[in-house]
Design a protein with these regions (language model features):
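Accessory cap/linker subdomain of secreted extracellular hydrolases
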Residues: 239-335
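Alpha/beta-hydrolase active-site loop
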Residues: 142-148, 171-194, 216
Length: 464
């Protein structure tokens, strides 16, 4: 049976401040080598952390980041262990990686919370490990995403990159990715060495599995973290309907993705564990266990064309139609709550992983509940290419929100390519230059344009 929906009854802001003062955060030295999170003592909180307020920093350390674990990133970076909340409202701890341009952030700089497409259960895929110098995280997407979100640093923004799946790696679980992202923001804003104003503006961005986590953060923010000044959220190809995605990908080249979701959800939903124990053969359970130890790309390659029916006595259509499964999937579905911040949703019409019809329906659910959604459907991109191609558009849209540029009324627009939009092509050169700096180990500093919007009123009206 699915857990009851958690209703936050957290501490008021003054109580949060008093709670934080009772346990001083520890300052650790920078790690001498990258250690997988489940073997790194930094990730284990001290006893008594449970009574602290959400977002309280438990310990911090400077960290050296690197592209692909090898090419040192010339930025300022720290890891923060902080108190957060799990699916059932219980206290837990996780880590966010806070990154700033090499010269630091200027007064008034915003914070971007970037939710990586972790899309795996193995702690090797957690961004706090994968982005460290010396990590062995072949097959994770964080390194590709780094080439995109590094461009935010050249705008003078700071970035929080949370391990939004938590230490269990429960990919696909609802609500808790949002809690972890929002508490990571709280931690980053209160971390004095980061140089941010505690009341700084915040933007949310994520793609694919990171878009799913970003959607949960946007949905949960009004009730869970109403004090945060979130200017807007960019949802890139989020998972709009998990049941549809299971049916769509089972037996396909990307069949490893739904198997990873099952491996993650069985850790937090008894109904999923019972389904696996009852209906999967020993070989099927072994497939899930091996997937749980794999990075995303490794699982996808290993399980290409895998069909669940091979190792189940019951066809997948019947499994997913069981009453217990329907209750779980209802709990997993986005769109029950209306985000109160403006949303930019970007989706490929011919996406081979996430069906555009599922995102159409998610956008409609949000609008029906009063959310403001700018929805761009891209005819020229598939799932992987849309992230880099939509990066200039995403960052320019967030820059406008930080600058106070008024959003256009909610609308849907289908385009040949997001690069054909003024806000999509502007900034492409900056993206290429920042990716070059990452790949060649050059310093990443804030450019002279700063963190505001460069757009004229006419451009603001016609970009999206």
């Amino acid at each position: 049976m699915a857990p009851a929906r958690h209703r936050r009854t957290g501490l008021a802001l003054p109580q949060r401040a008093r709670a934080q003062s009772r346990m001083k955060p520890e300052s650790w030295a920078a790690p001498t080598r990258a250690v997988v999170p489940d073997k790194d003592p930094f990730y284990t909180p001290r006893p008594g952390f449970e009574s602290l307020a959400e977002g309280t920093i438990l310990r911090s350390r400077p960290v050296e980041l690197a592209a692909f674990g090898l090419i040192g990133l010339k930025v300022r970076a720290w890891q923060l262990l902080y108190r957060t909340t799990d699916l059932n409202g219980m206290p837990e701890a996780t880590v966010t990686t806070v990154v700033a341009p090499l010269g630091g952030v200027a007064p008034g700089a915003p914070l971007l919370s970037f939710q990586c497409a972790i899309d795996a259960i193995s702690p090797r895929a957690f961004p706090s490990y994968a982005l460290q110098r010396g990590s062995r995280a072949i097959g994770t997407f964080a390194h590709v995403e780094l080439l995109c979100f590094a461009d935010a640093l050249t705008r003078g923004w700071a970035i929080s990159i949370p391990d939004h799946e938590g230490m269990l790696g429960a990919w696909g679980a609802p609500r808790e990715p949002g809690y972890r992202a929002l508490d990571g923001i709280r931690a980053a804003l209160s971390f004095e060495p980061g140089g941010l104003d505690p009341s700084a503006q915040v933007g949310l961005w994520g793609y694919s599995g990171g878009g799913l986590a970003t959607a949960w953060a946007a949905e949960m923010a009004p009730s869970y973290a109403p004090e945060l000044d979130i200017a807007g959220a960019v949802l890139g190809s989020p998972v709009g309907d998990l049941v549809s995605t299971f049916h769509r990908l089972n037996g396909s080249l990307h069949a490893g993705l739904p198997m990873l979701v099952v491996a993650g959800l069985r850790r937090v939903y008894p109904a999923f564990e019972e389904l696996v124990a009852t209906h999967f053969s020993d070989e099927g359970r072994a497939v899930l266990d091996k997937a749980a130890r794999s990075t995303t790309a490794a699982a996808v390659m290993r399980l290409a064309r895998y069909n669940v029916d091979r190792h189940s006595g019951t066809p997948i259509a019947e499994l997913l139609a069981m009453e217990a499964m329907l209750a779980v999937f209802a709990d997993l579905t986005l769109g029950d709550r209306a985000p109160t911040v403006p949303l930019l949703v970007v989706q490929g019409v011919h996406d081979q992983i996430i069906a555009v019809e599922d995102i159409d329906a998610l956008v409609q659910r949000y609008r029906d509940r009063g959310a403001h959604v700018t929805y761009l459907r891209d005819r020229g991109s598939e799932h992987i290419s849309l992230l880099p191609l939509s990066t200039p558009l995403s960052l320019n849209w967030l820059a406008d929100r930080f600058a106070g540029v008024a959003v256009t009324p909610s609308h849907t627009r289908t385009v040949r390519s997001v690069l054909a939009l003024p806000a999509g092509s502007r900034g492409l050169g900056s993206l290429v230059r920042s990716a070059f700096r990452v790949l060649f180990g050059r310093p990443i500093t804030a450019s002279a344009t700063g963190h505001g919007s460069e757009r004229t009123g006419r451009e603001a009206r016609h970009a999206a």
